[in-house]
């Protein structure tokens, strides 16, 4: 699965997935506004947004890259490109 994932935040608009996270929570960033990062948990019919600091989001994305490299994941290039676009 190499598709991009987007969510609509009720206040900040479109968010895009930056990295899968831990415990069923993924990391998303604002698409149009000043960069804000969210830890997002999706349950049956509810979505929970938690604002997180830039460095926490970057750390989680780096951990995801390391994990993808160890596994030899087919999606490694996708995550590397997203990391560069978002954090560098």
Per-segment meaning from a language model:
Residues 1-3, 74, 85-88:
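Short intrinsically disordered terminal tails
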Residues 11-73:
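Acidic, low-complexity, intrinsically disordered interaction modules
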Residues 20-21, 29, 80-81, 87-88:
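Ubiquitous "structural anchor" signal
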Residues 62, 69, 77-80, 84-87:
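Residue-level detector of alpha-helical secondary structure
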């Amino acid at each position: 699965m190499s598709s991009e994932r987007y969510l609509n935040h009720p206040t900040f608009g479109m968010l895009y997935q930056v990295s899968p996270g831990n415990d069923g929570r993924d990391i998303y960033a604002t698409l149009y506004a000043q960069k804000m990062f969210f830890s997002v948990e999706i349950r049956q019919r509810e979505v929970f947004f938690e604002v997180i600091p830039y460095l926490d989001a970057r750390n989680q994305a780096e951990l995801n890259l390391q994990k993808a490299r160890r596994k030899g994941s087919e999606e490694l290039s996708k995550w590397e490109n997203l990391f560069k676009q978002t954090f560098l």
